[in-house]
Amino acid sequence: ELLALPLSKGVWKLGELPNRRCSYIMDGKTEVVLAHDFSGGDRQSGVSFQAVTATRGGTALPAVSVHPPYRGGTGEAVVSYRLQLPAGEPAVFQAQTAIRDHDPKTEPASDGVEFVVAVATADDAAPARLFSRFSDSKVWEPVAVDLSAYAGKEIVLSLLAGPGPARNTTCDSAFWGVPTVVVGVQPQPLSEEAWREREEQAIALARQAAVGKRGAGAFTLRGEAGQYGAAIIPGDEGMV
């Protein structure tokens, strides 16, 4: 049984959490749970799970590599996490999805993989499928699912990868890139213009400090090379 991991405000990369569960659902029937923290391929079903670094479209990301089951039927590969979301905070699930390359000389192309994000609580008769995309993209495609309705609740968040409507599992190795839950309102990234403005302010303060005129956040330093200046311009959130 998965233990619930209480989340606080911040960015939680699911691939770094210890409470992952791997399973598969064959032909829409009962879920089959594999050994705790399973990694590799399952001989009976053909389903596979592995933590990898996947490069798609020139961008390398830590990812969970999966292949849907295909022996004795077809179905969905499922990676699940039990999470306790804090009350009063917004939350969103974010990830990137893609499938692997194939060798056209030796194997046919995948017709696509169906990526699904599902959430279940103790009150639900069945998991709610909040996101679904059937795709054969070999470059990263973003996923964003609002989890704010589950604030204050314990949930099982499941990432499913299946063969899609044709039930064709050929070359269906797929990736969940950097699956993440973001809790709370996060600072907005600075624009390039704002970064340049802060850089110019810091350089100006450092130059003044180099000649002994120290302002707030500026320092006059001395070493074997002589006297020089340094400066710090903190952001809206302070310094990290």
Regions picked out by a protein language model, each given a short descriptive name:
Residues 1-240:
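Gly-Asp-aromatic-enriched flexible segments
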